[in-house]
Amino acid sequence: MIRLKFLVQQFSNKMKKIIFVSFFLVLCSFASADSKMGLGLEVYNNKAQCGVCHTLQAAGSVGDIGPNLDQMNFQMSQIIYAVTNGIGVMPPWEGILSYEEIEAVAYYVFQSTNK
Protein backbone atom coordinates (compact mmCIF):
# COMPACT_ATOMS: atom_id res chain seq x y z
CA MET A 1 0.00 0.00 0.00
CA ILE A 2 2.84 2.38 0.87
CA ARG A 3 4.51 1.52 -2.44
CA LEU A 4 1.30 2.37 -4.31
CA LYS A 5 1.03 5.75 -2.55
CA PHE A 6 4.66 6.45 -3.45
CA LEU A 7 4.05 5.61 -7.13
CA VAL A 8 0.90 7.76 -7.24
CA GLN A 9 2.79 10.66 -5.65
CA GLN A 10 5.69 10.27 -8.14
CA PHE A 11 3.25 10.18 -11.06
CA SER A 12 1.43 13.20 -9.68
CA ASN A 13 4.66 15.20 -9.34
CA LYS A 14 5.70 14.33 -12.91
CA MET A 15 2.27 15.32 -14.21
CA LYS A 16 2.46 18.65 -12.39
CA LYS A 17 5.82 19.33 -14.04
CA ILE A 18 4.50 18.36 -17.47
CA ILE A 19 1.42 20.55 -17.05
CA PHE A 20 3.55 23.48 -15.84
CA VAL A 21 5.98 23.20 -18.76
CA SER A 22 3.11 22.87 -21.25
CA PHE A 23 1.38 25.93 -19.81
CA PHE A 24 4.64 27.91 -19.94
CA LEU A 25 5.23 26.98 -23.60
CA VAL A 26 1.69 28.00 -24.57
CA LEU A 27 2.11 31.28 -22.70
CA CYS A 28 5.41 31.97 -24.49
CA SER A 29 3.86 31.29 -27.89
CA PHE A 30 1.08 33.82 -27.17
CA ALA A 31 3.66 36.40 -26.07
CA SER A 32 5.66 35.79 -29.25
CA ALA A 33 2.58 36.16 -31.44
CA ASP A 34 1.59 39.36 -29.63
CA SER A 35 5.04 40.87 -30.10
CA LYS A 36 5.02 39.92 -33.80
CA MET A 37 1.58 41.55 -34.18
CA GLY A 38 2.88 44.67 -32.42
CA LEU A 39 5.94 44.90 -34.64
CA GLY A 40 3.80 44.23 -37.72
CA LEU A 41 1.43 47.07 -36.81
CA GLU A 42 4.39 49.39 -36.17
CA VAL A 43 5.91 48.57 -39.57
CA TYR A 44 2.53 48.84 -41.33
CA ASN A 45 1.61 52.21 -39.84
CA ASN A 46 4.98 53.90 -39.39
CA LYS A 47 8.09 52.44 -40.96
CA ALA A 48 6.63 51.30 -44.31
CA GLN A 49 3.47 53.45 -44.09
CA CYS A 50 1.44 50.80 -45.92
CA GLY A 51 -1.79 52.59 -45.02
CA VAL A 52 -0.98 55.44 -47.39
CA CYS A 53 -1.87 53.06 -50.23
CA HIS A 54 -3.84 50.23 -48.60
CA THR A 55 -7.07 49.95 -46.65
CA LEU A 56 -6.84 47.68 -43.62
CA GLN A 57 -9.55 48.09 -41.01
CA ALA A 58 -7.45 46.56 -38.21
CA ALA A 59 -4.80 49.25 -38.73
CA GLY A 60 -7.30 52.06 -39.26
CA SER A 61 -5.97 52.78 -42.75
CA VAL A 62 -8.07 53.83 -45.73
CA GLY A 63 -5.62 54.13 -48.62
CA ASP A 64 -7.07 53.78 -52.10
CA ILE A 65 -4.04 53.39 -54.37
CA GLY A 66 -3.32 49.72 -53.68
CA PRO A 67 -5.71 46.85 -53.04
CA ASN A 68 -8.07 46.92 -50.07
CA LEU A 69 -6.39 44.28 -47.94
CA ASP A 70 -9.62 43.52 -46.08
CA GLN A 71 -11.04 42.16 -49.34
CA MET A 72 -8.05 39.95 -50.13
CA ASN A 73 -7.31 36.41 -49.01
CA PHE A 74 -3.53 36.08 -49.29
CA GLN A 75 -1.33 33.33 -47.95
CA MET A 76 1.61 34.36 -45.74
CA SER A 77 4.10 33.43 -48.47
CA GLN A 78 2.32 35.70 -50.97
CA ILE A 79 2.41 38.65 -48.60
CA ILE A 80 6.09 38.10 -47.79
CA TYR A 81 6.86 37.90 -51.52
CA ALA A 82 4.93 41.09 -52.34
CA VAL A 83 6.50 43.07 -49.49
CA THR A 84 10.00 41.79 -50.27
CA ASN A 85 9.93 42.19 -54.07
CA GLY A 86 7.17 44.70 -54.68
CA ILE A 87 4.33 44.13 -57.11
CA GLY A 88 2.81 46.53 -59.65
CA VAL A 89 3.41 50.06 -58.35
CA MET A 90 4.23 48.78 -54.85
CA PRO A 91 7.95 49.21 -54.20
CA PRO A 92 10.15 46.38 -52.94
CA TRP A 93 11.00 46.65 -49.24
CA GLU A 94 13.94 44.24 -49.26
CA GLY A 95 16.99 46.08 -47.99
CA ILE A 96 14.82 48.74 -46.34
CA LEU A 97 12.99 46.48 -43.89
CA SER A 98 14.73 43.64 -42.11
CA TYR A 99 13.45 40.13 -42.78
CA GLU A 100 12.02 40.16 -39.25
CA GLU A 101 10.06 43.33 -40.08
CA ILE A 102 8.85 41.91 -43.41
CA GLU A 103 7.74 38.71 -41.71
CA ALA A 104 6.02 40.70 -38.92
CA VAL A 105 4.08 42.99 -41.27
CA ALA A 106 3.08 39.97 -43.37
CA TYR A 107 1.95 38.16 -40.23
CA TYR A 108 0.01 41.24 -39.12
CA VAL A 109 -1.80 41.58 -42.46
CA PHE A 110 -2.46 37.82 -42.65
CA GLN A 111 -3.87 37.62 -39.12
CA SER A 112 -5.91 40.79 -39.61
CA THR A 113 -7.54 39.61 -42.83
CA ASN A 114 -7.96 35.86 -42.25
CA LYS A 115 -10.50 35.66 -39.45
Residue locations for each model-derived region?
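Disordered, low-complexity tails and leader-like regions
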Residues: 1-7, 45-50, 69-70
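Short, non-ligating residues that shape and space the ligands of small metal-coordination modules
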Residues: 59-60
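Extracytoplasmic electron-transfer domains, predominantly the class I c-type cytochrome c fold
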Residues: 63-115
